[in-house]
């Protein structure tokens, strides 16, 4: 069957250095991403961004690519042709405020900052303007964080690891990671599955590309998942998680070149 859809992370995957669509991992000019997008357009395969970024950012990125659907805030919601579907379960905006405000009012971010003192902070300035999740950076044990939430009776939330980033912290050794505090039902995998159902796609006719542990879970919702080479290079946790999946390929190329490799190899297999 033809390739129906390509789900892709943005930062560190589709985008090159400096979060540019036209830069490779080293910062050189590259048309690899554009050529891959063109190839998808020629065969009628939809390209859907699955990002931790907030909705206005992802909407604009999708619009610039000519796409009408996208997944944002690490799977908290997806949009198709202007219609939004929340994936946050029982948590929803109400008279007490947005989901972001409800989580803040419960003191969960403060709890995590105190518990992981010096190892976790807001991912400024990108944590502003969010409505469904909180965005942090640092280097923490996600299982420890979620155990802490469970002990406090806040197990309707979870902390997820959205991969290594290039923003260092003076109190953290090595690469920092981006973390999202989200309702427990939220995941990129669930959002991808929800989007595919809404579009009527067979998961076997879809692929996904990413660079983080959270991205890797999307392998359960698609026929094949591609990890761009920079992902496991920068993240020991991702390297350790790879053997658990039998439908995952690590690309030779990094970032956008890896995305190009994933798209072109998938199209050639289906000729």
Question: Which stretches of residues belong to each language-model region?
Answer:
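Mg2+-dependent phosphoryl-transfer enzymes with acidic/Ser/Thr/Gly-rich catalytic loops
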Residues: 2, 29-30, 182-184, 189-271
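Asp-based phosphoryl-transfer active-site loop
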Residues: 2-23, 49, 219
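Glycine-rich phosphate-binding "P-loop"
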Residues: 14-27, 176-183
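Basic, amphipathic juxtamembrane/active-site segments
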Residues: 18-39, 227-229
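Active-site phosphate-binding/coordination module
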Residues: 28-125
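Short active-site oxyanion
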Residues: 42-48, 67-68, 133, 203-206, ...
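Charged, glycine/proline-rich intrinsically disordered loops and linkers
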Residues: 86-106, 160-177, 236-243
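Conserved acidic, metal-coordinating active-site core of Asp-based
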Residues: 114-222
């Amino acid at each position: 069957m033809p390739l129906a859809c390509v789900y892709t992370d943005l930062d560190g995957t589709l985008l090159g250095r400096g979060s540019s669509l036209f830069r490779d991992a080293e910062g050189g000019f590259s048309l690899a991403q554009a050529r891959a997008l063109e190839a998808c357009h020629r065969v009628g395969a939809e390209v859907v961004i699955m990002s931790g970024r907030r909705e206005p950012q992802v909407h604009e990125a999708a619009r610039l690519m000519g796409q009408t659907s996208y997944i944002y805030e690490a799977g908290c919601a997806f949009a198709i042709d202007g219609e939004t579907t929340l994936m946050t379960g029982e948590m929803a905006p109400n008279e007490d405020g947005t989901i972001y405000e409800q989580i803040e009012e419960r003191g969960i971010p403060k709890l995590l900052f105190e518990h992981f003192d010096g190892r976790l902070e807001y991912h400024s300035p990108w944590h502003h303007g969010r409505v469904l999740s909180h965005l942090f950076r640092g280097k923490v044990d996600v299982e420890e964080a979620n155990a802490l939430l469970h002990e406090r009776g806040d197990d309707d939330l979870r902390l997820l690891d959205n991969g290594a980033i290039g923003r260092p912290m003076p109190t953290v050794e090595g690469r920092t990671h981006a973390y999202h505090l989200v309702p427990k039902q939220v995941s990129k995998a669930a959002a991808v599955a929800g989007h595919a159902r809404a579009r009527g796609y067979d998961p076997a006719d879809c692929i996904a590309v990413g660079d983080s542990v959270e991205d890797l879970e999307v392998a359960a919702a698609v026929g094949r998942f591609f990890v761009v080479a920079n992902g496991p290079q920068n993240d020991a946790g991702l390297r350790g998680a790879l053997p658990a999946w039998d439908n995952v390929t690590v690309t030779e190329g990094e970032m956008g070149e890896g995305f190009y490799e994933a798209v072109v190899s998938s199209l050639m297999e289906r000729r």
